[in-house]
Amino acid sequence: MKEKSKNAARTRREKENSEFYELAKLLPLPSAITSQLDKASIIRLTTSYLKMRVVFPEGLGEAWGHSSRTSPLDNVGRELGSHLLQTLDGFIFVVAPDGKIMYISETASVHLGLSQVELTGNSIYEYIHPADHDEMTAVLTAHQPYHSHFVQEYEIERSFFLRMKCVLAKRNAGLTCGGYKVIHCSGYLKIRQYSLDMSPFDGCYQNVGLVAVGHSLPPSAVTEIKLHSNMFMFRASLDMKLIFLDSRVAELTGYEPQDLIEKTLYHHVHGCDTFHLRCAHHLLLVKGQVTTKYYRFLAKHGGWVWVQSYATIVHNSRSSRPHCIVSVNYVLTDTEYKGLQLSLDQISASKPAFSYTSSSTPTMTDNRKGAKSRLSSSKSKSRTSPYPQYSGFHTERSESDHDSQWGGSPLTDTASPQLLDPADRPGSQHDASCAYRQFSDRSSLCYGFALDHSRLVEERHFHTQACEGGRCEAGRYFLGTPQAGREPWWGSRAALPLTKASPESREAYENSMPHIASVHRIHGRGHWDEDSVVSSPDPGSASESGDRYRTEQYQSSPHEPSKIETLIRATQQMIKEEENRLQLRKAPSDQLASINGAGKKHSLCFANYQQPPPTGEVCHGSALANTSPCDHIQQREGKMLSPHENDYDNSPTALSRISSPNSDRISKSSLILAKDYLHSDISPHQTAGDHPTVSPNCFGSHRQYFDKHAYTLTGYALEHLYDSETIRNYSLGCNGSHFDVTSHLRMQPDPAQGHKGTSVIITNGS
């Protein structure tokens, strides 16, 4: 009996083993592997294989476990699949809703060191980091489907990062942390729906499983990665503030490395992609490595390039604490939407810079070369507008000119000045390197004359004999030379056309503008070197200078006055002003009359008065309608006297209103005129031949302006130094020997053009 029972048990075990052997041969595995499997592994692999039939009913062949005739095309397909797995640089895996690995390719051993047989049929939770269990559960969970029940199958995209166990040697494992390696998994969750026979509009769905591809992230050591022409790397702190950038970033994005250092990566990323970048940054801090989605990196000259980054946290070798972030970035496209500016960094970077600074004693050859180089560099770096320009506007006017309720003041235009060819330059003796923005106000500029009602209506006037041509030249000096062939169209840009540093042009310059030339003779022909505003990034605003001009000194000019000298000069002038004020307060009105040669009377500012039509040179003027008349005007020695006093309320427009309605900032173009006054020597010891016989007028609108901005040059708040009363008193005390140029700005509608304009009027008076 015992022998029979032993034989029966042996036979049963042999039959069982043969069945397991036959079952193992049915598995899609090499015979070398299946022959060494134990029974538990065969059962585990078989159940996993059966589950795969639910996911892929048509599976790996015509019928599971049945051999069939194979065609040459099928053999090619199998070989192609094998090669794809080898070149994938990753592994494919299928996970059931309960976390069981139904299938994983044999290439997993290359990245993890774990065999295919060991992983198949086991739970994936045994091979991932404990902190990633919740994330894996969320990935495998299917929510209520939003698709119609008539759709039988659909996929839900999944992309996530897992820290999987890695048993490779350190030299082959790459970057690991605690025996885990970051794997980027991307794939889809497959959902199948079924409809009920009794209720065709109701149904149920089945979560079939997750099909994904796992990729190993590149190692952190940059020396192990060959940087191609479309790649650059950067090193950043843990908050993504850039510390170091590869030089290739200049070729790919336009930014130099020093332009991006100490700035965060978020400042140079498209606003729609910052959320994805933030998520990637969070994953990087948690898991140590991450691959970002495709995002748009803003280029320097407008537009963007599509980039994908592989970032890694580098730990300190001594303390094993996170030290910094190293990222390898792949630039996938060329610059798209060139000229479209989405960042202030792009706006400031895309503006052409006009530099006029040179050495203290430049030669004529250097000046000529500098002018040519400025012209060529400016043409090559012309600014491109981020918004479409409409043909209905003037070709040189920005879009903000039309939209601004201030009528697009020429002091607040946003576009950069454009360069003229030498043939189109306004004058031969002036090197007007910048062409001024043409403004649609057909009223031009007027310099230092009295007006009657008839001239105010006719939009032009005649120069009297007392109106000297030099004053118009002085106005053209500060406001720019009118462009020839454009009639009353004036370039109202607050740029300073510089003269060429040659003796011939200097003599012509002094002969044409003797009053300004006299000022330069007193001060050694030195120009002010403050930056002037030509454009503004904000529509209708006069702030934030874009194109900057720095003037040059003439060849024979001495050193420019320093800030200390200017401060001493201004302090001395303040003392003189106070002394004159005290004397004028004590002196009666007849003494004032004896000092100035005439009694102090109120004359008119843009008022009606009767005067025979004078003869002289025709000068187009502003149509100053609806101006309030004053009482009378006083004449002295056949010359018109401008008013001594103008209240702030009587001025046409305060300078502070030149800026946009949403801004309280003063136009820097007006500030230039004030700074030119501050630089001028206002001592009464000049010769009479260096100044005109009639001193210019100081308008009351400058009182608030000087109160606010007198400190810009000296550093002290000289509150009462440059108000209209003080300047008038000083002018009387100096017997009219002082020359000053101030801007008087007036907002005036132009019905012919359909929007408002701004004209700048320079007047001269006692």
From Swiss-Prot:
Quaternary data: Efficient DNA binding requires dimerization with another bHLH protein. Heterodimer; forms a heterodimer with ARNT, ARNT2.
Pfam families: bHLH_HIF1A, PAS, PAS_3, SIM_C
Domain bHLH stretches: 1-53
One biological process term in Gene Ontology: cell differentiation
Chief location category: nucleus
Residue ranges of every copy of the Single-minded C-terminal domain listed in the record: 336-766
Chain residue ranges for the region called Disordered: 353-431, 528-563
Native organism: Homo sapiens
Coiled coil spans: none
Biased composition (Low complexity): 373-385
Biased composition (Basic and acidic residues): 394-404
Motif Nuclear localization signal location, chain numbering: 368-387
Statement: the UniProt record of this protein carries the keyword Repeat: yes
Keywords assigned by UniProt, alphabetized: Developmental protein, Differentiation, DNA-binding, Neurogenesis, Nucleus, Repeat, Transcription, Transcription regulation
All copies of domain PAC, residue ranges: 292-335
SUPFAM superfamilies the record matches: HLH, helix-loop-helix DNA-binding domain, PYP-like sensor domain (PAS domain)
Protein name, as recorded: Single-minded homolog 1
Domain PAS: residue ranges: 77-147, 218-288
Function noted in UniProt: Transcriptional factor that may have pleiotropic effects during embryogenesis and in the adult.
Compartments where located: Nucleus
Domain of life (superkingdom): Eukaryota
